[in-house]
Amino acid sequence: MTIKGDEMRVTRFVSATKLRRFLAGMFLVIIHHSSFIIPPAAAAEYPARPIRWVMPYPAGGSFDTVSRALAQRLGERLGQQVVVDNRTGAGGTVGAEIGAKSPPDGYTIVAGGEGTLVVSPILRKNLPYDPTKDFSPITQLASINYILFAHPSVPFRTVSELIAMAKAKPGQLNYASGGTGSAPHMLAELFKYRTGTNIQHVSYKGSSPAINDVLGGHVQLMFTGLPSILAQLQAGKLRGIAVTSRERLASVPDVPTFIESGVKNFEASPWYGALAPAHTPRPVVERLYREFAAVLKEAPIREFLTRGGVEPVGSTPAEFAAHIRHELKEWREVISRAGIRAD
């Protein structure tokens, strides 16, 4: 009996020791992941300090212009400043990586579009982030109507004249883009594929320096979001060739669409949205979505966006996540058929 009693005491001691070790381990796990959990009181107080909005694109571009207008109103609604932080490079992937690897505490937002979330993940090997795993989508903010424009000195004024010249002088025309995998790059390659033309790509570190070189007459063509060059178009410093929308735009009524210019199935509106690092607490993501959606419904904001050829969206986090997955599938097929490569 004494032996059995000792065995029982030993068994209880071992079991208690294992339980303590298990509970200690669970405590460490909870502490490690505590940044993913926001108590109700803390969630109600969010945000308690300024929020950084990582912008993978240069200042002055379409996404940057739209984001700064939204950031001001978002900050006013949240009661904290929203600071746009331009972190450019590698077609936007530098800023996207910074956003993906930031603490998931609700104080980092990252802008993302087709280039960083769809095209670069398809074209580039060893990308330092996964668009479907390393972000918590907040909302698709907008779709931006793009325009093909040229320096006023070019000898063509219409899409048909451009195609004729490109076919007569293959490889002698060139177009600028804000980097490999960017929306301007993909649209130009899609145009070449659909029209059977050979136009050389000149890649820049962002859309702003690319636009400047078209303004200077160093490069002949470029696709970009309309807000980036609307003032230069209206001043006659640049020439609009065609817009990618279904119908003509009120802000540039004399510029035809690609469809009416004879290029069928060429309707495209590059999009972009707001995301947070993966594992950002769900209540924070939902709060940011509600505030963004409210800002996008405000009449002055909608007027500012639509005047520049930007269509407000404001989709839910789930809808935006599904949209990213759909775009990955669609663009993977287009890139494969067109033979587009990272150059």
Predicted feature residues:
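An extracytoplasmic/periplasmic, membrane-proximal ligand-sensing/linker region
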Residues: 48-50, 193, 260, 282-343
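Hinge/capping helix and adjacent helix->loop/strand transition within the periplasmic-binding protein
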Residues: 101-107, 122-209, 258, 271-304
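Sec-dependent N-terminal signal peptides
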Residues: 21-29, 342
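N-terminal (or domain-start) structured segment
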Residues: 43-133, 172-174, 180, 196-223, ...
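Short, basic, low-complexity termini and linkers enriched in Ser/Thr/Gly/Pro
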Residues: 1-18, 29-39
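C-terminal lobe and pocket-closing loops
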Residues: 157, 229-297, 329
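A ligand-binding cleft/hinge motif common to bilobed small-molecule-binding domains
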Residues: 116-126, 190-194, 221-255, 332
